[in-house]
Amino acid sequence: MFDRSAAYYDRVNTVICLGMDVRWRRWAARRALASAPARRPTARGRDTSLGLRVLDAFGGTGLVALELARRGARVTLADISPGMMRIARRRAERRGLSLDIVAADLTAHAAAELPGAPFDAITVSFGLRYVDDPAGLLRGLGAALAPQGEIVVLEAVVPCGGVVAALAGAYFFEVAPRVGALLAGRGELYAQLTSTVRALGGAGDVLAHVRAAGLLPQEQRLFAGGVVAGVVARRPSGMVSSPAST
């Protein structure tokens, strides 16, 4: 399904997100690099992301991965859609950026076995809702982190509480899928979007999956009236690494 929609997927999403998705992804990239354990000061006393190893899990067309690479990180993008990864590769080439793009089903294979592991940081943007066992996925990603490394999760969620959340939810679940289906001609894609978000639940449910994975929540952010949640979690010092990451 994602292969068939790869050519227009990002454009349609930006329209139905009213352009706000750019800011969300920039936040994820910036936050992933902000406190990576390998980050070092420059001669002028400013932090640098140069050389930090980052995994962009479920990286798709590379929007977050390219933000990370633009900031100097060494990025591994992992996804299962050849069409999406093809676009990511083309974008990287056009911008003169380097991405290590790997075809990998992270629900079936250990992230710690990917090239570049262990990683200083990992991003998971709008992919958690598509897996049957979110906590299990996050646990596997946590094992691929360097000690004290962090995972940044960005995900669409069911908003809760207040008038703003109700309006945002009405737009996201009723208006946006219709607009997306009209623009893309693929109603089933946007029907799946809303159904998977409802199945995942709210921001509190994402946080619960993070805790169930044995990770330590550090920060939670809500965007767009609570329709999008950002969660930052750290690998605890006692978490067991996969043999491939030791």
Where do the protein language model's features map onto the residues?
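A short SAM/SAH-binding and catalytic strip from SAM-dependent methyltransferases
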Residues: 120-134
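Core SAM-dependent methyltransferase catalytic element
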Residues: 213-216, 221-246
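N-terminal, positively charged/glycine-rich alpha-helical extensions of SAM-dependent methyltransferases
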Residues: 1-8, 172
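A short glycine-rich, Lys/Arg-flanked "PGG" loop and its adjoining helix->strand segment in the class I
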Residues: 135-150
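C-terminal alpha-helical "lid/dimerization" subdomain adjacent to the S-adenosyl-L-methionine
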Residues: 154, 158-213, 219-221
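Class I SAM-dependent methyltransferase SAM/SAH-binding core
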Residues: 53-110
